[in-house]
């Protein structure tokens, strides 16, 4: 699949880092530049109803050859995470034979002691960074895999298929990917995001997510005359965070365990803000975490009545499991497609969110499929080419199997 590798290496040269501080959609001009290039490519491929709107949402259709088959969607996002993403220079480690991988010309290393799963890829071709940027496999690998699968279906009209809708979204990494998704021009019965990790991942559960800002307002007085009058908001914030459960943080949890994560803090004597993210798979656990924060704020306010402590909670997205379970055939079809591609399905929860989570609540059930990548959002990101090829085969098999499904 030379075209797959060529596509991916071309796509990662586009600088598409999203910008959470910019309220515009898309939040960065590079995403529109990439979207226009993809739009041209899809038109040249011969897809129908190729549409790129002012917000950077790109949709197209591969018409089916089975009139009664359900229409499905394949979705990926164009932006990359909040990490250095300009001037990406991939390196290809052909026929990996084990051991550490030097990244570029510096001292950065993809070390086997840190990533023991590297041993699973002996003899394969690994695409890595040069140690100075992320790679962008999240989610340009998904885009390359989708379009390569579409290429294969175009070249093999004997493969039965219903309509296949393709959607590429902006700003997924900053939680806005579904904000303006054009469902009116995306008439799929259900869809799949191709935005997962290692080979075989199949996900239809994700975190419930919220953000919490705790604002501490104190009283700044000259420190030489501060006795009895200064209220140092930073001290209060430190007390607050020190009382948070250390066993319920991202670095101490996995699987179905939720957490509180102090993502950012800034402050002065007068005013300090702590910005947390709250994650839990269980609805009751999610509600309990938010209640726990409220109780902690109220308790500290009683201890420091001369200060003012304010809590703002904002829900971000919800666990899509409740929206997928009434349509479990779409998960079973994905499992069968992986097995047909000689891939072992690995059903696991997403310790994060995807566009598909919100789209599922908008009426488009949307589980998540693997891309094959590892270590997303940083300089140690890499992806095995053979896993990408398996993703393409899985998508082709998914289209074929879905063409025979009648609900």
UniProtKB/Swiss-Prot annotation:
Residues at the active site: 79, 172 (proton acceptor)
Lineage: superkingdom: Bacteria
Free-text comment on the cofactor: Binds 2 Zn(2+) ions per subunit.
InterPro entries xref list: ArgE/DapE_CS (IPR001261), Bact_exopeptidase_dim_dom (IPR036264), Peptidase_M20 (IPR002933), Peptidase_M20_dimer (IPR011650), Peptidase_M20B (IPR010161)
Cofactor(s) needed for function: Zn(2+)
Catalytic activity: Release of the N-terminal residue from a tripeptide
Keywords: Aminopeptidase, Cytoplasm, Hydrolase, Metal-binding, Metalloprotease, Protease, Zinc
Binding site for Zn(2+) 2: 138, 173, 377
GO CC terms: cytosol
GO biological process, one term: proteolysis
Any one GO molecular-function label of the UniProt entry: zinc ion binding
Keyword Amino-acid biosynthesis on entry: no
NCBIfam families named among the record's database cross-references: peptidase-T, PRK05469.1, PRK13381.1
Purpose of the protein: Cleaves the N-terminal amino acid of tripeptides.
This protein's name: Peptidase T
Source organism (scientific name): Aeromonas hydrophila subsp. hydrophila (strain ATCC 7966 / DSM 30187 / BCRC 13018 / CCUG 14551 / JCM 1027 / KCTC 2358 / NCIMB 9240 / NCTC 8049)
């Amino acid at each position: 699949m030379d075209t797959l590798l060529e596509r991916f290496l071309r796509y990662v040269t586009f600088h598409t880092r999203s910008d959470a501080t910019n309220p515009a959609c898309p939040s960065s001009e590079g995403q529109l530049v990439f979207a226009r290039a993809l739009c041209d490519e899809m038109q040249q491929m011969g897809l129908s109803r190729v549409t790129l709107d002012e917000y950077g949402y790109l949709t197209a259709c591969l018409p089916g050859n089975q009139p009664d088959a359900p229409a499905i969607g394949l979705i990926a996002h164009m932006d990359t995470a909040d990490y250095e993403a300009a001037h990406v220079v991939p390196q290809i480690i052909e026929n990996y034979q084990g051991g550490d991988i030097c990244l570029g010309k510096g001292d950065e290393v993809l070390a086997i002691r840190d990533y023991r799963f590297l041993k699973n890829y002996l003899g394969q071709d690994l695409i890595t960074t040069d140690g100075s940027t992320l790679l962008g496999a999240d989610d340009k690998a998904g885009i390359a895999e989708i379009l390569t699968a579409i290429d294969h279906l175009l070249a093999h009209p004997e493969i039965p298929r219903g309509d296949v809708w393709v959607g590429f979204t902006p700003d997924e990494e900053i939680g806005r990917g579904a904000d303006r998704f054009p469902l009116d021009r995306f008439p799929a019965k259900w869809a799949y995001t191709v935005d997962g990790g290692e080979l075989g991942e199949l996900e239809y559960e994700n975190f419930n997510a919220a953000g919490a800002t705790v604002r501490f307002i104190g009283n700044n007085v000259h420190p030489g005359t501060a006795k009895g009058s200064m209220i140092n908001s930073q001290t209060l914030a430190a007390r607050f965070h020190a009382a948070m459960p250390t066993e319920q943080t991202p670095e101490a949890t996995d699987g179905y365990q939720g957490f509180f994560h102090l993502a950012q803090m800034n402050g002065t004597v007068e005013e300090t803000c702590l910005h947390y993210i709250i994650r839990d798979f269980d609805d009751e656990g999610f509600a309990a975490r938010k209640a726990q924060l409220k109780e902690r704020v109220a308790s500290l306010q009683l201890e420091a009545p001369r200060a003012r402590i304010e809590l703002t909670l904002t829900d971000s997205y919800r666990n899509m499991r409740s929206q997928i379970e009434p349509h479990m055939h779409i998960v079973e079809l994905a499992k069968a497609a992986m097995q047909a591609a000689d891939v072992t399905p690995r059903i696991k929860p997403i310790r994060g969110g995807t566009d598909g989570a919100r789209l599922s609540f908008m009426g488009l059930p949307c589980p998540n499929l693997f891309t094959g990548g590892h270590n997303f959002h940083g300089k140690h990101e890499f992806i095995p080419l053979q896993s990408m090829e398996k993703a393409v085969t899985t998508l082709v098999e998914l289209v074929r199997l879905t063409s025979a499904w009648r609900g």
